[in-house]
From Swiss-Prot:
Protein name: TSL-kinase interacting protein 1
Tissue spec: Expressed in flowers, roots and leaves.
Subunit and interaction comment: Interacts only with active kinase forms of TOUSLED. Interacts with SNL1.
Domain of life: Eukaryota
Length: 743
């Protein structure tokens, strides 16, 4: 009593303003000298505070000292103040109650702390401090990191529930059973209110940790009440008014017995629930959606005794993964245009309110162009046309995520759809929010995809002419007279029978003539940046005396240096060309006489091929001649040689006769070192193979050296060329005689 009276005097001293001498004055209304003396003593012990009290921030060391003292001495502010020397008693008291308010704000209603129950409150505060130490964070900084804050709150709730279950189990193991008198009083109290046959649950505000007191008759304090919770009905009753201290102690003993009896009933119900948990889960799955339309929780709709404490805690501690999908394509495209991801997956606790999910979506997508109207959630099977036939959840819904999950049938994958909608004038029909941009349907998307596939197939089909590739953009190079097609379709035009080599992407070369398609020989040459003429002209120069080919050199790559080379298999290209032409007749395929191209020049560029063609008939030579009478020296195109190979010497073509006969009319020009375009100075060339009229010409080499089908016999030509180079001395004279005839 003396401590309470001293505390009352302190409060009165703080309320009375200071006098002129700085001493607090206390009005003694009862004119009691003892009261005045005790008040003066309290005033001298605790001087008046300053008008503006500054509550300094608590450092980590001060908080550690506070919780260490709280663990040792409990709720004793004077002893705690002696441990925390940098703070006074008022600051310690303020910190204690401020922490209680903060924890009640963060915890749910089932775990609210009562400051009148210091044992549970102190235990919860110590749990709070241990978790702060675990996460290495101050309480004032928790909200700055939402993820860590969420984990912190969940861990705290789990620990408090665990402590509460442990205390209940401890009391049960001690054998504190409910007396018959206590059960009779509870049953008669319920029977008076017509609640005898209904299951009920007792919730005591100050009954978790009640000290054992001596016997006696009891009555309650003002403010202590016994709440009877019957589903949604709560009744508060107060037993007795006033009385003596011994009656209060007797009531607390009865209250203790009642709590123990309720614990026994709860344990029995838990055991019964575990035996029939499968059946109850099936019943909850079969519940229709109309049961939850009133907004009641599934746990509150059933009786309180049907749900054990452990199962309820398991339900609340579980997690749900919610996948959100847009209600239609308009919403999806609008969010994607605003650089938002229209598909989200959220991890929620079971008791997370569905309205919190809507608030999160509004904060995330509130600036989007489609965020007009009210954001609603629907079941996953809802569509834009049938939204009025389905359930919906708004920001006013107070259901939890677990309840919504039960309403949609508790699927294995929890999915909902969202959309922005407005109500019409009557408020009964929901119409979708109109959007400014047109939204193509799913069929339009399928048509676009199908069109892209058709375009891809067209580019990979047969050989296309210039007219059929209208989407290609052509760039003309006047210096060489070439048309390089580079457009959407960068793949070579091939026939249906062609073998398609792997991983080839070659830019085709077209004729200047728009109506002429690419010939098969040109297509074979376009598969690599090494031309057929270059290949044949460099074979003799690179063969060693032992017949072993050294590594390939750069050669005459300047003719196609502008063509990108991405083919990784030249053997596959040759095989495709042979497969294309092996079944065709050996009739000669004349070239188009309306245009000249790089490939016409390269067909006669090879010096060896041209010299061997001197054996052939003049009609066969004329068939492979380039049109328009372009001047050539040893099969070289004069325009390209003069433009690109100045270091190899210039050529003076002769205009004596037929254009194809101009270059080889003087065979000594070809044999002179330094002037051969392909660098074949070391190769022995005969003086003239034409007039010798050898039998080998007509019987062995005539058919092989005809460039039939525009290089159709490519493989035979290569084999014959190599064979002819090795047997070149069979046709000529002695080496000295040949050198005497050379200029």
């Amino acid at each position: 009593m003396l401590k309470q009276f001293t505390h009352y005097c302190e409060m009165q001293a703080e309320l009375i303003p200071e006098g002129p001498n700085g001493e607090g004055r206390l009005s003694n209304q009862n004119s009691n000298p003892n009261l005045l003396s005790s008040a003066s003593i309290s005033i001298t012990q605790f001087p008046a505070k300053k008008p503006t009290r500054q509550w300094a921030a608590w450092t980590h060391q001060e908080e550690e000292s506070f919780f260490t003292a709280l663990r040792q001495v409990g709720k004793n502010f004077e002893k705690i103040t002696s441990r925390v020397q940098s703070k006074n008693k008022d600051q310690v008291r303020h910190y204690y109650y401020r922490l209680v308010r903060r924890m009640n704000k963060l915890l749910g209603p089932d775990l609210s702390l009562d400051a009148k129950n210091p044992k549970d409150t102190n235990a919860a505060m110590l749990r709070w401090w241990s978790l702060l130490e675990k996460y290495s964070c101050k309480a004032s900084k928790l909200h700055l990191k939402p993820r860590r804050f969420k984990l912190f709150i969940e861990a705290l709730e789990h620990q408090l529930l665990k402590d509460r279950r442990k205390s209940i189990r401890k009391r049960t193991c001690q054998g504190e059973n409910l007396s018959s008198a206590s059960l009779g009083n509870i049953s008669s109290h319920s029977r008076e209110r017509g609640l005898d046959n209904r299951p009920f649950k007792l919730i005591l505000s100050d009954g978790q940790n009640v000290k054992k007191l001596g016997p006696g008759r009891a009555s309650t304090k003002h403010g202590e009440s016994l709440s009877v919770n019957l589903g949604d009905e709560k009744e508060d009753t107060a037993f007795g008014r006033g009385g003596r201290q011994r009656r209060k102690q007797g009531y607390r003993k009865w209250e203790k017995a009642a709590i123990d009896g309720v614990s026994l009933v709860a344990d029995a119900a838990e055991h019964l629930e575990r035996t029939s948990i499968d059946k109850d889960m099936d019943d909850q799955t079969d519940l229709g959606p109309t049961r939850y339309l009133t907004g009641k929780s599934p746990l509150s709709l059933c009786s309180a005794g049907d749900v054990p404490l452990s199962d309820a805690n398991m339900q609340f501690s579980a997690k749900l993964k919610l996948q959100l999908f847009p209600i239609d394509e308009c919403t999806r495209r609008s969010l994607e245009m605003d650089k938002h991801n229209p598909h989200l997956e959220l991890t929620l606790s079971n008791r997370k309110k569905i309205s919190s999910v809507l608030e999160h979506l509004n904060r995330k997508w509130g600036s989007s162009s489609c965020a007009t109207g009210e954001l609603l959630l629907f079941p996953y099977n809802a569509r834009k046309e049938t939204v009025t036939c389905h359930q919906r959840w708004t920001h006013d819904s107070f259901l939890s995520a677990a309840e919504v999950h039960s309403m949609v049938g508790s699927p294995s994958v929890f999915r909902l759809r969202y959309g922005w909608f407005v109500h019409d004038a009557s408020g009964s029909i929901i119409s979708q929010v109109p959007t400014s941009d047109p939204c193509p349907s799913l069929e339009d998307d399928m048509n676009v995809d199908r069109l892209n596939e058709v375009n891809m197939l067209l580019t990979e089909s047969g050989p296309l002419s210039v007219h059929s590739t209208a989407e290609q953009t052509t760039s003309v190079e006047p210096s060489q007279g070439l048309v390089c097609a580079s457009g959407v379709h960068d793949r070579p035009a091939r026939s249906r029978d062609d073998y398609e080599p792997a991983s080839t992407s070659i830019t085709p070369l077209e004729h200047l003539s728009g109506g002429n398609a690419q010939s098969p020989g040109e297509w074979a040459d376009s598969l690599t940046n090494i031309s057929i003429g270059d290949l044949l002209s460099e074979v003799p120069d690179d063969i060693d005396s032992d017949g072993v080919d050294p590594p390939a050199t750069e050669g005459s790559h300047y003719l196609l240096r502008d063509v990108p080379f991405t083919s990784d298999s030249f053997d596959a290209a040759i095989a495709a060309h042979i497969l294309r032409h092996q079944n065709k007749p050996s009739a000669q395929l004349p070239l188009t006489s309306g245009s000249s191209s790089l490939w016409d020049d390269e067909e006669t560029r090879d010096a060896f091929s041209f010299q061997k063609n001197r054996f052939a008939n003049s009609t066969e030579l004329a068939s492979v001649a380039s049109p328009k009478g372009v001047g050539r020296v040893n099969g070289e195109p004069s325009q390209l040689v003069e433009a690109s190979s100045g270091d190899e010497g210039s050529y003076n073509p002769h205009d004596d006769g037929d254009p194809m006969e101009e270059g080889p009319a003087d065979p000594h020009t070809m044999d002179s070192p330094g002037k051969t375009p392909c660098g074949l100075a070391d190769v022995y060339w005969p003086d003239s193979l034409g007039p010798l009229d050898l039998d080998i010409r007509s019987s062995k080499y005539t058919d092989d050296l005809i460039l039939s089908e525009s290089l159709g016999g490519l493989s035979r030509l290569i084999a014959t060329s190599l064979d002819a180079f090795q047997n070149c001395s069979l046709f000529g004279f002695d080496n000295k005689k040949d050198k005497s005839n050379m200029v």
